[in-house]
Amino acid sequence: MDPYKHRPSSAFNSPFWTTNSGAPVWNNNSSLTVGSRGPILLEDYHLVEKLAQFDRERIPERVVHARGASAKGFFEVTHDISHLTCADFLRAPGVQTPVIVRFSTVIHERGSPETLRDPRGFAVKFYTREGNYDLVGNNFPVFFVHDGMNFPDMVHALKPNPQTHIQENWRILDFFYNFPESLHMFSFLFDDVGVPQDYRHMDGFGVNTYTLINKAGKSVYVKFHWKPTCGVKCLLEEEAIQVGGSNHSHATKDLYDSIAAGNYPEWKLYIQTIDPAHEDRFEFDPLDVTKTWPEDIIPLQPVGRMVLNKNIDNFFAENEQLAFCPAIMLPGIYYSDDKMLQTRVFSYADSQRHRLGPNYLQLPVNAPKWSHHNNHHEGFMNAIHRDEEVNYFPSRHDTVRHAERVPIPTTHLSARREKCNIPKQNHFKQAGERYRTWAPDRQERFLRRWVEALSDTDPRITHEIRSIWVSYWSQADRSLGQKLASHLNMRPSI
């Protein structure tokens, strides 16, 4: 008997009600009782099973990116980059690969409004012939801190106060003044783009620096950029209040309704590349996740397009159980020494094992669509049917073999063990440059948001903390620092 043929699914439904084990249920409305008024009998197994299943419906919420929406579609290569990478799904223009994408807010809970000022997650899973590839990013090109050691504390500071369960400004300001590299990220978060209009009208970025390797073994650093063909649109404060007040799931609804109506969202994929031999030529560290690569000296190169043309069939199966991890790579794409990326490689998979179990990659939405083979087996919720006798390697009785060798970066490393910051700091220049590109009204809105944050009357936002933030923004842009100090009745200092 085929163990998969009769697996419970909507495609193999019974015409009548059953228990989980398949026994017929003749009454799904009434408990088994002594007489018509009770008490209820414990022997009513269907009642016990129904309640027990209900009690366990919820799984642990993602510690970040809890609120999200997913959609399916395809990625198509439009420009040849085979000279940069040997990744099979990027081998030639015209090649299409199925994808599933999850958009999300970052900090707030699963049921929170989608109009809050918060970064947005932008994660893409490619189902390729060489296995799955996860490109896990955000709608901003940079991050708050450049060392993953600080990530748990950063999330704690952004999350609600553990005593009151309220997100509070003083905690955010108190934590991040210790990390001036966060200024660049705040130039995005407190900008108009801090509240996207919806998921269709926002950029996506791989954020971290990765590595591309071609067939000859030549490697380059790479940054990934998704650009929506319908443009970037944002909600200002009054608009966010109005939209969020009428529908706290507006972005999820917009995504679903647009696809259902045939108005398919589309993004163009671009890359930037740097030869690792030239990484010391820049005034920033290319592996610093708090910095962007200036497009005037490192131009965008077109790669392909992504179209989302199918809604998910089940929210739990294809959104809540959908799991991403930057460690899931393919031949031709590799990690870099980006400190934040290095910690994400471990933390994401570890989080999914906690949330979904050790066999989370067997769930249909996470499983590869191509054949695979290894000796990772058993454990909680194992769903793979195996009938082989040999579960070790190597063996003369098993024909499975090693795959062909694939190129990986061959950088030679020699240094002392150290715990230290990235040597090239330069925390303020890019934040200031970004601010100066805006129109005056956009600058004024940015200033107003910072004045509001620093004017919070909580006594834990001390004069010292305000002074530090004014100093930081003064170093980014002198006029911005002066305006901020003036609104706060303070003296600007650098």
Swiss-Prot record:
Name assigned to this protein: Catalase
Taxonomic placement: Eukaryota, Viridiplantae, Streptophyta, Embryophyta, Tracheophyta
PROSITE patterns assigned to the protein according to its UniProt record, in alphabetical order: CATALASE_1, CATALASE_2, CATALASE_3
Cofactor requirement: heme
Similarity field: Belongs to the catalase family.
GO CC term (a single one): cytosol
Enzyme Commission number, as recorded: 1.11.1.6
Provenance organism: Pisum sativum
GO BP field: hydrogen peroxide catabolic process; response to hydrogen peroxide
Gene3D superfamilies: Catalase core domain
